Regions:
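Structural alpha/beta core scaffold segments of enzyme domains
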Residues: 1-521, 579-583, 611-618, 622, ...
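Amphipathic, heptad-repeat alpha-helical segments used for oligomerization and assembly
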Residues: 267, 441, 585-603
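Active-site "cap" helix and flanking loop/linker of ATP-utilizing ligase/carboxylase catalytic domains
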Residues: 531-567
Length: 644
């Protein structure tokens, strides 16, 4: 294929060795000699955008994969109306998914002659499509099966071992197995995008927001992956869940020779929120205004237009979520004013306590005009009464408990105990596509497809069909892409809403931050399985904790330096917050199944800026980059005259 002879990143695969043993494969690998012609490379996205920079792809001038613009109102007039202007440049880093099970898979020829790949992934039919494209095979010759596994977080959204497995079995006609080591996993799959966000906000003395000007640069790495979709989310979230009459955004995702970046829990939301919520907290401090009160003064409500010219989809609960989180965290409402006392301080002046607040919203589904569908088949078996319900669904279970929730929703839709439901899942040979298990979409999409299939199956049952089968494909409400000039669009059909209060204790001499308490209010629409919802909230907070304070992914000239979990530190049991209060709110999503909306990504989004605000509350020092490691904190504290 055109361009396939160019190595653009250390993640590119050069050769495939298949052997009977690992030792034989290693010996064969060591015999390979590759002749390279060195090409110029670029690793900084700002440098990559300049004229004369090395070009990674012929169709991307100045290495710009995409440029999104938003032009709403009159930005100059908005700043002229402002009494105060807050500016900041925010930088976020790569993040490794660090799921406990590294990439692995098995391939073979099944009884119908299909190349069959059993692997962990997030979209069976997309994996099938990409294998077919790579091997030039028709879909009926390729089968993909997903076993349930313990984690993905977006890291299994793109190709890893799937095509290599299929290629080996297709060529040899034999079963093939592959298991990546941890080092191979860290080097071999995409990461969360690093972002540079320059933000300038204007507001009146009473806290009314007047203008926001934002410039975003995202490092896509060497290939596109999901970078354009991640950037779209960041554009939506870079001004937070707040109303601005005047907005000017320029957002770019840029090719570099770094390893590719792609889907990761939050999908652009954490990067956008880090800038937006820091701006909001800085504005509150500059105005001498409570951060909760300032948010409630400007928060998006039902029918209020966003900065892309259209309101959020029906079912907006952001004000209620902020209020409930604040109350649970000790804020008091006095008329329109909100207040919270500063946490009591330790007697030892070395350690200081503070509390920070953050809010966020996140789309459910890819949206931005992408067609969103999910297929389900329900088969009812029995005689006079329904004795068994078989649900066929392609949705993957990647540790979030999707298949349990599928069974619960099928039982509710059919009207039988959940014990009568059997789920046949994640096999391209049994059911149509469900779309990706990502973007917090699967409960919403699967639930609606399951309800539709149940209605059809029950109708067939009433017509005396045995077995009674219902086959239904749900189509989500239509959305639209950014207008190329104004950015105006109807980007998403559903949203989830979250707010967090984080209390920390900071040691100004060592830079160590201990998170004492987290209150997380999350509107889930309807908690189909409350235990799983609570687990998702706590899991997202732990993962966000690593992003905020610990996980320092390092790359130099495209080479990953932190290839081991001994050098890339993720939270352990002694690192996580002491206490997490999960506040599960249920404001029904009008289009959601049983009122449910997606929720698993949302608790990640406001955590890092809430931690930054808590550190500021404790020490008076702002941090505009993450991770906020002890070394970086100590350096900043010393500059501020804190500690030794």
């Amino acid at each position: 294929k055109e361009g396939a002879d160019i190595v653009r990143t250390t993640m590119d695969q050069i050769a495939c060795v298949i052997a009977e043993t690992e030792e034989a494969a290693a010996r064969a690998r060591d015999l390979i000699r590759v002749e390279y012609e060195d090409l110029p490379a670029v690793f900084d996205p700002i440098e990559a955008m300049q004229d004369g920079a090395p070009q990674l792809h012929a169709d991307a001038k100045n290495n710009i994969l995409v440029h999104y613009k938003v032009r709403t109102g009159d930005i100059e007039e908005g700043f002229a109306d402002a009494d105060i202007v807050i500016e900041g440049t925010y930088r976020t880093s790569w993040q490794e998914h660090a799921y406990l099970q590294p990439e692995a898979g098995l391939s073979y020829i099944d009884e119908e002659g299909r190349v069959t790949v059993e692997v962990a992934g997030q979209w069976t039919h997309k994996d099938q499509q990409q294998i077919c494209h790579a091997l030039d095979l028709p879909p009926e010759k390729v089968r993909v099966i997903y076993p349930a596994i313990g984690g993905a977080f977006g890291g299994r959204e793109d190709m890893s071992v799937q095509i290599v497995l299929a290629l080996a079995t297709w060529k040899l006609g034999r079963p093939v197995k592959i298991i990546w080591s941890r080092e191979e996993s860290i080097r071999g799959h995409h990461k969360r995008h690093p972002y540079i966000i320059e933000a300038k906000w204007g507001a009146k003395r009473d806290g009314t927001l007047t203008a926001a000007k934002v410039r975003i640069i995202s490092d896509a790495g060497a290939y596109a992956y999901t970078s354009t979709k991640v950037l779209g989310n960041a554009v939506m979230m870079c001004v937070g869940p707040y109303y601005f009459p005047n907005v000017h955004v320029d957002a770019y995702t840029v090719y570099t020779n770094n390893i590719p970046t792609g889907a990761f829990r939050g999908f652009g939301g954490p990067q956008g929120a880090f800038a937006a919520e820091n701006q909001m907290n800085k504005l509150a401090a500059a105005l001498g205004m409570d951060p909760v009160e300032l948010r409630l003064k400007n928060v998006l409500r039902e029918g209020v237009p966003t900065h892309v010219g259209t309101p959020l989809s029906p079912g907006v609960s952001m004000p209620e979520v902020i209020e409930e989180c604040a109350r649970r965290a000790g804020w008091r409402q006095e008329g329109e004013n909100w207040r919270r006392e500063k946490p009591p301080q330790p007697e030892n002046g070395v350690k200081r306590r503070g509390i920070g607040f953050g809010a966020g919203f996140k789309n459910v589904g890819f949206s931005f005009g992408a067609p969103e569908t999910a297929n389900a088949i329900i088969e009812l078996r029995g005689g006079a009464e329904i004795e068994e319900v078989i649900l066929y669904h392609a949705g993957a279970d990647v540790g979030q408990g999707a298949h349990t929730v599928f069974a619960q929703m099928a039982a509710e839709a059919v009207g039988v105990p959940v014990e009568k439901v059997r789920v046949v899942a994640s096999d391209t040979a049994t059911v149509g596509s469900s779309g990706s298990v990502s973007a917090s979409r699967m409960t919403f999409m699967a639930g609606n497809s399951i309800r539709g299939a149940a209605e059809k199956a029950l109708e067939a049952w009433r017509n005396e069909e045995r077995p009674a089968i219902g086959n239904y494909t749900y189509h989500a409400p239509k959305t639209s892409m950014f207008d190329p000039e104004t950015g105006h669009c109807y980007p998403n059909f559903s949203y989830g809403y979250v707010a967090q209060a984080v209390e920390v204790e900071v040691d100004v001499e060592t830079g160590f931050v201990e998170v004492l308490n987290v209150v997380c209010a999350d509107d889930v629409g309807k908690a189909i399985n409350p235990q799983q919802v609570e687990g998702q909230i706590e899991g997202a907070i732990v993962q966000a904790h690593g992003y905020a304070l610990m996980e320092d992914f390092q790359m130099r000239d495209g080479h990953v330096l932190t290839q081991h979990l001994s050098t890339y530190l993720i939270p352990g049991v002694l690192d996580v917050p002491r206490h997490v209060e999960s506040v599960i709110l249920e404001y029904a999503e009008p289009n959601g199944p049983f009122g449910a909306r997606g929720m698993a990504e949302m608790p990640f989004i406001p955590y890092t800026p809430a931690v930054a605000a808590a550190i500021y509350d404790a020490t008076g020092v702002w941090f505009d980059s993450q991770p906020m490691t002890p070394q970086r904190l100590v350096e900043a504290f010393r500059k501020a005259g804190l500690g030794n």
